[in-house]
Swiss-Prot record:
It holds the Pfam family PhoU_div. InterPro entries: DUF47, PhoU-like_sf, Put_Phosphate_transp_reg. Belongs to the UPF0111 family. Gene3D superfamilies: Phosphate transport system protein phou homolog 2, domain 2. It comes from Chlamydia pneumoniae. This is UPF0111 protein CPn_0681/CP_0066/CPj0681/CpB0708.
Length: 224
């Protein structure tokens, strides 16, 4: 891992980008890890869960370095507090991915015909919100390096709306999943039921935090 001093030597926003890349590397495992669960490849699932934890730890290291060494007097188009808030929200997404991965190692879960397809739609909608937010962050980084005006700023604001739409659609799918889980016809072991609820709740955190991050970026754009 590059030192923070070297990263700041390249650009004041390089550490933010380095942290973002580590967050992406955590979330990228979400679809493969649930696919492994569905297919019964539990050893692969355990390996991926460990990799997610390793990546999350690296993201934490970058976050902590920024908190400790980000110069207060550095001239930037966004405040030091603003940068630290953005990286904190980014980091919460990596935390959520790790939480999901760890939950899947506690007990072997099963997919059931009545919820499998809906769950993967729900997962994909959360990942869609995250991917849109990553696109927004790349646009935001370009704006930071130049200015906050023009069509790029307009494109960034449109992306914020798309993230909010994806998060809402994720909420709708989550409610549909809950209706299945609490229906009289859906009968599974109690421990598995409880663990699935935790998995679904934490998975929803990906789109929740993505929307929060998108709104924080939008606030920065509106301040300019």
């Amino acid at each position: 891992m590059q030192t923070l001093a070297r990263l700041f030597g390249q650009s004041p926003f390089a550490p933010l980008q380095a942290h973002l890349e580590m967050v992406v590397s955590c979330v990228e495992y979400m679809l493969p890890i649930f696919t492994a669960l569905r297919d019964g490849r539990y050893e692969e699932l355990l390996e991926m869960a460990k990799l997610v934890s390793d990546k999350e730890y690296q993201a934490d290291c970058i976050k902590n370095d920024m908190r400790n060494h980000l110069p207060a007097g550095l001239f930037m188009p966004i405040s030091r507090a603003g940068i630290l808030e953005i990286i904190s929200i980014q980091d919460s997404i990596a935390d959520t991915a790790e939480d999901v991965a760890i939950l899947l190692t506690i007990r072997r879960l099963n997919f059931y015909p009545s919820m499998e397809t809906l769950f993967f739609r729900f997962l994909e909608k959360n990942l869609e919100a995250f991917e849109l937010t990553m696109t927004l962050l790349h646009e935001f980084n370009q704006l930071l390096e130049s200015s906050f005006g023009g069509r790029k700023a307009d494109k960034a604001r449109l992306l914020v709306g798309r993230v909010a739409k994806s998060e809402h659609e994720s909420d709708v799918l989550q409610r549909e999943l809950m209706q299945i889980f609490f229906s009289d016809d859906f009968i599974i072991p109690e421990k598995e039921f409880y663990l699935w609820l935790q998995v679904i709740r934490r998975t929803a955190g990906i789109s929740d935090s993505s929307e929060k991050l998108a709104h924080r970026i939008n606030m920065t754009l509106e301040e300019k």
